[in-house]
């Protein structure tokens, strides 16, 4: 019974102390001999005022039980009000540590300084450095508030989210401006370097390529003049094989050796050759006989090597053959050529030949031919 009365008396006395503490929050606990609350392991600070006298063991046991009950529930003292939004966002207020979230209701600057750890110091240094870089020289640091400006409980006037909201807005702008300026410098630098690279290699290549080009221009090309070509008549049998190889290489229509012999043996004076450096580069084979009471000359074959064209070799050979036919009283000259052979058509038409007749599928390859004719009388 005595224990129950003592416990009730202690509980009543504790409630009175608690009510007086709530009414006078600025009351200094050191002046009344009360002991400051200990920081529990769950990260919340509880300030419980105990009496200086230790002779009342039941009261102490009751306070211990109440303290355990508060710890088990996960809540601190009623003095621990809800955190402001800025404190929750930033994780610290009034110099409190970011990791421990310690609140000091006593308002003592010494106690607040004792709750700082290395993390809060580092964060304050980083905030100062960022504000200096951002150009906010007049902004105050949220972790370095004056003692007289620090209230007992966290309020909206001294929360840490006020200063960051005013200082963090210009900081990204400044960083963006700096980044833009740096990007411009980098871009201009890369542009200059690229322009130099674009300008420099072509000059190097040009310098390296100039000697080659000049060397190629200085090389004497094997230019052959028309005066170097030698024209002669057919002379002997040993020229037969050279004529055959030349014509077979240039003409599409195959001829047997008997065809060559027919023309060359019967009209050797109407066969002319063009040579250069003792090599035959052109040949013409013709005939002249009676056709319907008319002496008709006929150009059977004309060939010039490709590398010796554009030297008027073909024109010269045809002219020599026509002159020989005229000397033998020829009345006309005829020939056939492919319709798609435009160089041959131009050659003969320039000499006075006209298109007389179209011969369908005249050649073995199925190509049509055009008959050209030149009249003397």
Curated annotation (Swiss-Prot):
Residues 1-208 are annotated as: Disordered. The keyword Cytoplasm applies. It is found in: Cytoplasm; Nucleus. Residues 192-201 have a biased composition (Basic and acidic residues). It comes from the Eukaryota. Its main location: cytoplasm. Disruption phenotype: Flies are viable but display a 'held out' wing phenotype, characterized by the abnormal positioning of the wings, a typical feature of muscular defects. Flies also show male sterility, reduced longevity and age-dependent loss of motility due to developmental muscle defects. Keywords: Acyltransferase, Cytoplasm, Nucleus, Transferase. GO terms for cellular component: NatC complex; nucleus. Residues 26-45, 153-169 have a biased composition (Polar residues). PANTHER family: N-ALPHA-ACETYLTRANSFERASE 30. Catalytic subunit of the N-terminal acetyltransferase C (NatC) complex. Catalyzes acetylation of the N-terminal methionine residues of peptides beginning with Met-Leu-Ala and Met-Leu-Gly. Component of the N-terminal acetyltransferase C (NatC) complex, which is composed of Naa35, Sbat/Naa38 and Naa30A. This is N-alpha-acetyltransferase 30A.
């Amino acid at each position: 019974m005595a224990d129950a009365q003592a416990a009730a008396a202690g509980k009543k006395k504790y409630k009175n102390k608690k009510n007086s503490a709530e009414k006078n929050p600025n009351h200094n606990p050191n002046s009344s001999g009360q002991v400051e609350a200990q920081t529990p392991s769950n990260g919340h600070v509880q300030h419980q005022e105990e009496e200086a006298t230790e002779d009342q063991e039941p009261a102490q046991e009751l306070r211990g039980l109440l303290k355990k009950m508060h710890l088990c529930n996960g809540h601190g003292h009623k003095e621990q009000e809800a955190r402001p939004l800025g404190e929750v966002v930033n994780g610290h207020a009034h110099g409190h540590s970011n990791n421990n979230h310690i609140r000091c209701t006593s308002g003592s600057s010494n106690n607040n300084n004792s709750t700082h750890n290395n993390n809060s110091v580092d964060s304050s240094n980083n905030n100062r450095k960022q504000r200096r870089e951002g150009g906010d020289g007049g902004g105050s640091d949220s972790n370095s508030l004056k003692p007289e400006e620090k209230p007992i409980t966290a309020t909206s006037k001294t929360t840490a989210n006020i200063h960051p909201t005013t200082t963090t807005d210009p900081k990204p702008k400044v960083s963006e401006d700096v980044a833009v300026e740096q990007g411009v410098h980098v871009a201009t630098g890369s542009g200059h370097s690229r322009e130099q690279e674009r300008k420099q290699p072509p000059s190097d290549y040009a310098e390296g390529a100039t000697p080659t080009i000049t060397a190629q221009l200085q090389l004497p090309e094997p230019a052959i003049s028309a005066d170097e070509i030698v024209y002669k008549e057919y002379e002997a049998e040993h020229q037969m094989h050279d004529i055959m190889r030349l014509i077979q290489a240039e003409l599409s229509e195959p001829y047997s050796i008997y065809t060559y012999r027919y023309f060359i043996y019967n009209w050797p004076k109407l066969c002319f050759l063009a040579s250069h450096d003792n090599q035959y580069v052109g040949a013409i084979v013709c005939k002249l006989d009676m056709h319907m009471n008319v002496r008709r000359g006929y150009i059977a074959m004309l060939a010039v090597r490709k590398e010796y064209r554009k030297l008027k070799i073909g024109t010269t050979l045809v002219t020599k053959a026509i002159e020989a036919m005229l000397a033998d009283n020829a009345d006309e000259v005829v020939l056939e050529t492919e319709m798609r052979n435009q160089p041959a058509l131009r050659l003969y038409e320039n000499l006075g030949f006209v298109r007389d007749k179209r011969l369908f599928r005249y050649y073995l390859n199925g190509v049509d031919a055009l008959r050209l004719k030149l009249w003397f009388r």
